[in-house]
Amino acid sequence: MAWLSRVRGVSPVTRLAAIRRSFGSAAALEFDYDSDDEYLYGDDRRLAEPRLGLDGSGPDRGVQWVLMGAPGAWRHVFAERLSKLLEVPHISMGSLVRQELNPRSSLYKEIASAVNERKLVPKSVVFALLSKRLEEGYARGETGFILHGIPRTRFQAETLDQIAQIDLVVNLKCSEDHLVNRNETALPQQEFLGSMLHSPVAINARRESVGVYAQEVEEYYRKQRKLLDFHVGGATSADTWQGLLAALHLKQVNLTTSQKLTL
């Protein structure tokens, strides 16, 4: 697992400051909504200064992984489980945006307006949120993460590579039937977004939209040998979780009293 050992030499705070300046002057680009991530997304990029590679040979940093996949593939669930198991923070772009849906936030009006009008959150806003989150985490001593919600396009993936040292991208795949059933039966309604976002028509539209860009993102990471495809069947079942751990060459020692791993 040599891909767990790479690290950048430049301070992440320095890189994030540069990225924030460049995007502050850029035209506002937009991101789409995915019900699996609860809200709207954005973009981000690279951290650094690690903890410890899982193979024991890397510098002192945690893993920096991305979870991607079709809407309804339980990315949020698996990202949360992996973050606890690997003892790195789970960063969800959907959650970061949701936190700013507070009248006291300087970004509230811009985000609320986009949500209420079913428009996309500007890219400049998303990058600002992610940059802030990474800076705050680094200041607290965080050196790794499990990220989901981005990248959605090749451009976002390239941008992410300028901010964070992505070690691995887990691509969660599932059948068409599972996607529809999962969205129709398992997702709670979000009041401010309205039930129309969870209708079969909306679900299919999101899936088609995501699929167009997903292929280019998959190819981007596949060429870097960072992509791991994993088929989600029963989604949250114990067998699926154990299958994911096996695919990642991880083993959870004790599910009830320990978060230790073996390779």
Swiss-Prot record:
Instruction: Check the record and name the InterPro entries matching this protein.
Output: Adenylat/UMP-CMP_kin, P-loop_NTPase
Keyword list (alphabetical) reads: ATP-binding, Kinase, Mitochondrion, Nucleotide-binding, Transferase, Transit peptide
- List the GO terms this entry assigns under cellular component, sorted alphabetically: mitochondrion
Compartment(s) of residence = Mitochondrion
Q: Where is the transit peptide?
A: 1-30
Q: What class does this enzyme belong to in the EC scheme?
A: transferase
Which Enzyme Commission numbers does its entry carry? 2.7.4.3
**Positions bound to AMP:** 98, 119-121, 149-152, 156, 206
Organism domain of life: Eukaryota
Q: Which reaction does it catalyse?
A: AMP + ATP = 2 ADP
Q: Which GO terms describe its molecular function?
A: adenylate kinase activity; ATP binding
Region NMP: start-end pairs: 92-121
Q: How does it assemble?
A: Monomer.
Role of this protein: Catalyzes the reversible transfer of the terminal phosphate group between ATP and AMP. Plays an important role in cellular energy homeostasis and in adenine nucleotide metabolism.
Q: What's this protein's name?
A: Probable adenylate kinase 7, mitochondrial
